[in-house]
Regions:
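Bacterial N-terminal signal peptides that target proteins for export
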Residues: 1-12
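A residue-level marker of the well-folded mature domains of exported/periplasmic proteins
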Residues: 3-5, 26, 30-352
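Core hydrophobic alpha-helical transmembrane segments of single-pass membrane proteins
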Residues: 13-17
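C-terminal motif of bacterial Sec signal peptides marking the signal peptidase cleavage site
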Residues: 18-23
Length: 352
């Protein structure tokens, strides 16, 4: 869940994304380091991964980034150094994190989340021979790969699914933090719902606002928000809220006939959510792992990607998960909606 914004050295980003950290293997450091996985022999590619709040283990966005780096390390040999942010981080903290990785010889370095955009803009200039990748923002520099996604398109399909599955003509959307990136998820979802059935009521709630990024890493807040919507009559709830969405899924699982829609990863198949999987209708999968892997591979191959690389619905950058078979009966309608988006017949909004 994140905003794409063109930034120059004078620009500033506004938010952080939720993530959580665990792994196997390992190197670590004092800069809020999480354990890091390693693959292959010493002397291989050295991958630096800078997570935002939470890091590896969020069962969502950051875990998807981790899968991409893990795959690359295993395939090409080498190691991964992972550093994770805190909710109290300043811009200087993010800059220091990237600088530490670059000074230690990690190349490429992946910054996970748009809050790193100003830091990448600055540090990439200081280390012109190091290749940087940033997820969910655009930084204009010759040594930066901007990895973006059309979240609104995938969320539109989630809205279609919600509209076709609700029994009460009442659904909900939970956003982690009230920032432009998450507004893309909301906009696509609401449009998908109303294009399918304009009579359906959509409840919307954001868990935090402004510079308070706790909404991306507070499962208790997600659970409370979802429970409020369920009590108010909603029976399908889509969350774009990092690990806070795990709490929403838990709440939905306690209500017979209600559905949760996951985000970023195929949450039906996440071990930590296994006991709730029969309440997960689908997930709006954002293939961050593909973008991260493609970037690392390009550096390994000596042809580093740079500039804007957008992963759209047409390129399978976003999609709806089919695990569990709960949307099999509506798949033809979802496929039809997808084709209309890909062909340009449907223009999906990026703001509510």
């Amino acid at each position: 869940m994140r905003r794409v914004a063109k930034l120059s050295a004078a620009c500033a980003a506004t938010a952080a994304l939720a993530l959580t950290a665990t792994a196997c293997g390992s190197t670590s450091s004092d800069n809020n380091a999480s354990p890091s996985s390693s693959g292959g022999a010493k002397g291989g590619i050295k991958i630096g991964l800078a997570y935002d709040v939470g890091g590896r283990g969020d069962r969502s966005f950051n875990d998807s980034a981790a899968r991409g780096s893990d795959k690359a390390a295993k395939e090409f040999g080498g190691s991964i150094k992972e550093l994770t942010a805190k909710t109290s981080d300043t811009e200087a903290d993010r800059e220091q994190r990237l600088s530490d990785l670059a000074q230690a010889g990690y190349n490429p370095i992946v910054a996970v989340g748009f809050s790193y955009a100003p830091a990448v803009t600055k540090i990439a200039k200081q280390f012109p021979k190091t290749n940087f990748g940033i997820v969910d923002s655009v930084v204009n520099a010759s040594n930066v790969d901007s990895i973006t996604f059309t979240e609104e398109q995938g969320s539109y399909l989630a809205g279609v699914a919600a509209a076709l599955k609700t029994k009460k003509d009442h659904v909900g959307f939970i956003g982690g933090v009230d920032v432009p990136l998450i507004k893309k998820f909301e906009a696509g979802y609401v449009q998908g719902v109303h294009d399918t059935n304009p009579k359906i009521k959509v409840d919307t709630q954001y868990l935090s606002h402004g510079s308070d990024f706790s909404g991306f890493a507070s499962p208790d807040k997600g659970k409370a928000a979802a429970q409020g919507m369920l009590d108010n009559g909603a029976d399908v709830i889509y969350s774009a809220a990092g690990s806070s969405g795990n709490g929403a899924i838990e709440a939905v699982s306690g209500t017979k006939g209600a559905w949760a829609i996951g985000v970023d990863s195929d949450q039906y198949n996440i071990p930590g959510l296994a006991k709730y999987k029969n309440s997960i209708l689908t997930s709006m999968v954002k293939n961050v792992d593909v973008g991260v892997y493609d970037f690392i591979k390009s550096v390994h191959d000596g042809k580093p990607l740079a500039g804007l690389n957008a992963y759209s619905l047409a390129k399978n950058g976003v999609s709806l998960a089919t695990s569990g078979g709960f949307i099999n009966d509506i798949q033809p309608k979802l496929d039809a909606a997808k084709q209309k988006i890909v062909s340009g017949q449907i223009k999906v909004k990026t703001t509510p």
